[in-house]
Amino acid sequence: MAGKGIRNYLEHRPLSVSFEVTYACNARCKHCHLGGPVPDEKRATADQYAELCREIKPFVAQISGGEPLLRRDIEEIARALATRGKAAMIVVTTNAALLTKDRYLRLREAGVDEFSVSLDYPDDRHDAFRGIPGLFRKIEGLIQELHEEKRKAITFSCVVQRDNFLDLPALARLAIEWDVRINFSTYTWLRTKDMGYMVPKERLDDLRSITGHLLEIRRKHNNVFASEYVFNRMIEFFENGGIPDCRAGERFFIVNPDATLSPCGLIPGQYKTRKELRADFMPRNTCTECNTSIRANCEKPLWFQFKDNIKNLSG
C-alpha cells in the first residue's frame, strides 16, 4: 500500500482526495463555516464517485462532508469506491454522532479502512466545541461497544487551537487507553476568518514542549499519526500566520457533492476534470492560509513520506 503512495508522489498524482458527499451537517463546530441542512443539494451517485475515483487514482479516498453519515447511501458509496473505484484506502471523516456499532461494521464490510473521528477535548468540553450535546459520551460509548474488535479502525482527529493545545497529551493518553490512534490538525482561520483560535506566539514554546512529548508517545506507542515534520509545520503556521507553496490541485483536492472538483475545502470551485483544475488553479495559487492535516501530510518531501508512511502503516 505504501508503494502506491510513493508512486503517486513520483507521478504527481494526488495522494489524498476528499469526496465531500454532502455539505449538510448535524454539528455547529466553532471552527467551521458549515453546519445545518442544505435544501435541494445536488448530489452525485455512488457510481459517479466511483468513476471519478478510478480516473483520479488517489492513494487515500476520504468520504467527508459536512457530515457524510447523513447520506443514506453512504455504505453504497463506500462499496463503490472500494470496488469499482479501486481506492487503495478509504477513510470516513465523521463527528460520530450518527456512528453506531452496527453502522461501523456495515461500513467496514463495505470497504472502509479507517474512521477519522473528531475529538478536540478529552472530556465534555468537546460537546460545546462541536455543538452537539452529549457527543463525548456518545463517542466513549461507541469505543466501549467495539472493545471486542481485534483492531478498532478509528483515528481521533483533533484540531489544535488556542483553547485545547494544553490538552493534547491527555488526548493522546486517552487514545492509548481506548486502544485507538490519534491525529492532530492545525486550526485554520480561513474557514471563519476568526484569528482568535490561533495559538499565540507567546505560547509557542509551550506548544513545542507539548509536541515533543507527543513524539515521545508516538515512538513508544505508535498511536500518534502526526509526525515531527507535521508538528514543525504546525508551529511554523502559528508563528507566521501561514505556510507558502500550497500544492492543492496536485497533491490533494476535493470532489464536491455534485462530483465537480474544488482545489480544497476552503477554496470552492466547480471544475469538471483534474486537468482543468490543475491548468486553471495551480498557476495562480498563492494561498498560504491553512495547514490542515490533509495538506500537511500530502506536502511532505519524499523522504518524510516514505519514513512516516512506513511508521504509520505498520501500526
Cite the ranges covered by each PLM segment:
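Cys/His-rich metal-chelating microdomains
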Residues: 24, 28, 35, 249, ...
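Flexible loop residues that form catalytic
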Residues: 37, 66, 120, 187, ...
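Flexible mid-to-C-terminal extensions adjoining Fe-S/redox cofactors in radical SAM and related proteins
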Residues: 13, 240-246, 258-315
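Conserved alpha-helical substructure of the radical SAM core
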Residues: 1-114
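Alpha-helix N-cap/loop-to-helix initiation residues
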Residues: 70-71, 100, 161-165, 270-271
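Radical SAM enzyme [4Fe-4S]-AdoMet core and its adjacent flexible, acidic
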Residues: 42-45, 105-249, 257-258, 262
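Short, intrinsically disordered, charge-biased short linear motifs at domain edges
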Residues: 14-19, 229-235, 253, 269-281
